[in-house]
Regions:
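Glycine-enriched loop-and-adjacent helix/strand subsegments that border the catalytic/binding cleft
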Residues: 61-215, 221
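Generic structural signal for buried aliphatic residues
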Residues: 128, 230-231, 255
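N-terminal non-catalytic cap/leader segment that marks the start of a structured domain
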Residues: 1-96, 254-258, 273
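Residue-level structural signal for beta-strand termini and adjacent loop
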Residues: 32, 204-205, 270
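Extended hydrophobic-aromatic, low-complexity segments
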Residues: 200-203, 228, 266-268
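A conserved acidic, glycine/proline-rich C-terminal tail/linker
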Residues: 210-249
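Charged, cofactor-coupling segments
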Residues: 1, 5-24, 156, 165-178, ...
């Protein structure tokens, strides 16, 4: 099942409605959000249908309770650390580490993401993200862009803490959440394009840590909430930092992240905030 948040183009809705996509139609769900739908707070209203061409898709979870972004692809870890003269620590193989990102800075498909102030090295990061359901288990998957300001991040992390301002200005999610009965997050081609040019390619199956390990580590000594986001981390070659060509994003660039079985998340880089 493909779930979404959507707004009919002829209506001005602040948050949108939850829906289920079937072919070229969207069926509205009798719930306020996908989080409430996951907890059993809604069902399909068969009479509230819209043509997919007549709606705008929104971020499937507009303000998640939390965003944990993991570090699950060995190629990305190895290349990123090698650029700083570092090896992959043994502990990386033992635990699926993560950092917390900013739930208040989530963007949906087709939205312009403001170019952050004080950076000259804006980067995309190609990731798969799990969305937690009402039972604390993974309910489905979406595409995630963990936007990064590399020069800010580089400065901050010299202190031994972070990332902070190098990351918390934007995370994009979308275009849909595909439930685990249709997509289990074990494989699928991952591609990033900038202005139509392919820049990155990898596969979900290259993850070192499993989704079970990621979910269980996230839940240890705490409680996962409906709508929590668990990012996979960047696939190998899935960011400009890793490519090493210095072709950083500029205002007006169109970034498309595509994951086989999930969809295409497209955003335009906006003007400086």
């Amino acid at each position: 099942m493909k779930l979404c948040m959507f707004s009919p183009m002829d209506r001005d809705l602040e948050r949108g409605w939850p829906g289920r996509i079937e072919g070229d139609r969207v069926i509205q769900l009798a719930a306020q959000t996908l989080q409430s739908f996951f907890t059993g707070g809604g069902s399909a209203r068969e009479h509230d249908e819209f043509a997919l061409a007549d709606v705008d898709l929104r971020a499937p979870v507009l303000q998640p309770p939390s965003i944990r972004d993991f570090y699950a692809f060995e190629q990305h870890v190895r290349t990123a650390r090698a650029s700083r003269g570092l090896d992959v620590p043994q502990e990386w193989y033992e635990i699926p580490v993560f950092y917390f990102s900013n739930p208040a800075a989530v963007y949906g498909p087709e939205e312009a993401v403001p170019y952050p102030a004080a950076t000259k090295e804006l980067d995309y990061e190609l990731e798969l993200a799990a969305v937690v359901g009402g039972d604390g288990e993974i309910a489905g998957f979406t595409v995630m862009n963990d936007w990064s300001a590399r020069d800010l991040q580089r400065l901050e992390m010299k202190v031994g803490l972070g990332p902070s301002k190098g990351k918390d200005f934007a995370t994009s999610l979308g275009p849909v959440v595909v439930t685990v009965d249709e997509f289990d997050g074990s494989s699928g081609a991952m591609v990033a394009r900038v202005n139509g040019e392919e820049r990155s390619r990898g596969d979900v199956g290259d993850m070192h840590h499993t989704w079970r390990a990621i979910r269980d580590h996230a839940a240890r000594n705490t409680r996962l909430l409906p709508g929590d986001i668990l990012g996979s981390g960047t696939v190998g070659t899935g960011c400009i930092l890793e490519l090493g060509d210095g072709r950083w994003l500029q205002p007006g660039d169109v970034v498309e992240l595509e994951i086989e079985g999930v969809g295409v998340l497209r955003n335009t880089v906006g003007q400086p905030a």
